[in-house]
Amino acid sequence: MGGSILGERVLRKEDPKFLTTGGKYVDDLLDEPKLAGALHVTYARSTVAHGKILSIDTSEAASMPGVVAVFTAADLGLQPVPSSFNPMATRTLLASDKVRYVGEPIAAIVSTTREQGEDAAETVYADYDVLPAYTDVMSAMAPGATLIYDACGSNVVFDTTVLGLPENTGDDFFKGCEVVARGMFTNQRVAPCPLEVRGSAVAWVDGRLHQWISTQHAQGALAPIAGANGVDPSQVRILTPDVGGGFGAKIGAYPEEVLLGVISSKVGKPLRWRETRSESMVALGHGRAQVQQVTIGGTRDGKVTHYQLHAFQDSGAWVDMGTILAPFMTRPMSSGVYAIPNIECRTTSVVTNTTPTVAYRGAGRPEATAAVERAMDLFALELGMDAAEVRRKNLIPKFSEPHTTVVGQTYDVGNYEESLNRSEEHTSELQSRFGISYAVFC
């Protein structure tokens, strides 16, 4: 094989192991000498979506069987850490002043067994001054909404206009269109749910931190872990065993992983942590979560000439990768596979009192496709025209040389009309028994 994998047959090398003896994941590191005598960490989590923390009582947890230590942010001396994507948003790795979503970690329990830690976590009691909670972007943006991050001055934490990209021009954009259709869609929030939940293990050896993580991006975990432990990155070694799925949600490092080295240095023992499936549902980053305001216009014979999308990205309760990456990728894919000559696309990211969103399977591109495909259906409905025929009239014509869309995305090859024709051939026999709809994903 040459220097590129493009056009080459690439054989998977990992399958024989997984199909025979099986993989070796973080939880399988039972014979690792550095982890001999490791204790287990469990995190107590917030039970309210938004509130000021008045006090955290860990006394009962500390007295339970098998519990070695219990730590809050104050016990560990944790300082606020700014978001990489908006430095005005800060948080401590264990919530200290307020909680912002159900499942946010507020205390860490170190125990002899995992089960002892889970029992102890149930007894940690936090007293909250409960604040209004927002679970959707529209309520979080409403006038007078309580700020989730006071220093940000707004629950809107990112907008493509700050990059110099133009605002949408509203109804003026559609002057001259014979037909205009509008819609508001929700691209529903999803939980990634990899077969292997998050897990990590740490050991300090001769002043150097060795950390095993179930991650898709070991390099991205290095800086935050080194920073939290106050050491040079050269003193941290990140090891990634087999990873049982991630889908984008295991990119980077989470507070539960970053804290392990800090806690290990306090107790003087290696540590293991693995979340439960229930924890994974509320604390592993979520995906999608866009509200999409679409307007589409064109001629009465079915030609789309103008398309406008304003995507409101739900960032969840932290300004993370989902705040920037998903909307960034929505814009260049907003045209889908259609030759629409005029497109406006703006994205606005909003924090809410929900699990933070991250990069998940396409990160913004499937959302863009869903929006334009729904818009095509709206346009067809407004015209009273067959939805497949509207698509056929607007597909990018067959091309052999690279084609660049009006939003700057270059497609190297394509014959989308042929694909549509073939799909119609396969579905024609089902028409009498089933409703048929179409969508094109590139």
Regions found by a protein language model. Name each.
Residues F71-E104, M138-D150, G220, I238-L259, ...:
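Short, surface-exposed loop/turn segments at secondary-structure boundaries that line and modulate
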Residues E425-C442:
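Single conserved hydrophobic/aromatic residue that forms the stacking wall/gate
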Residues K24, V48-H50, D75-G77, I106, ...:
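Short, glycine-/Ser/Thr-/acidic-enriched flexible segments
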Residues Y43-F71, A108-Y128, S200-V267, I324-M333, ...:
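Alpha-helical support elements that line or immediately flank enzyme active sites
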Residues A73, Q235-P241, G268-S278, T305-H310, ...:
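Beta-strand segments within the central parallel beta-sheet cores of soluble alpha/beta enzyme folds
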Residues V99, V202, I263, I296-G297:
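A structural signal for short hydrophobic beta-strand segments in well-ordered beta-sheet cores
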Residues E8, K13-T20, N155-S200, A289-A375:
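Glycine-rich loop/linker segments at domain edges
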Residues M1-N155, G183:
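Flexible, low-hydrophobicity surface segments
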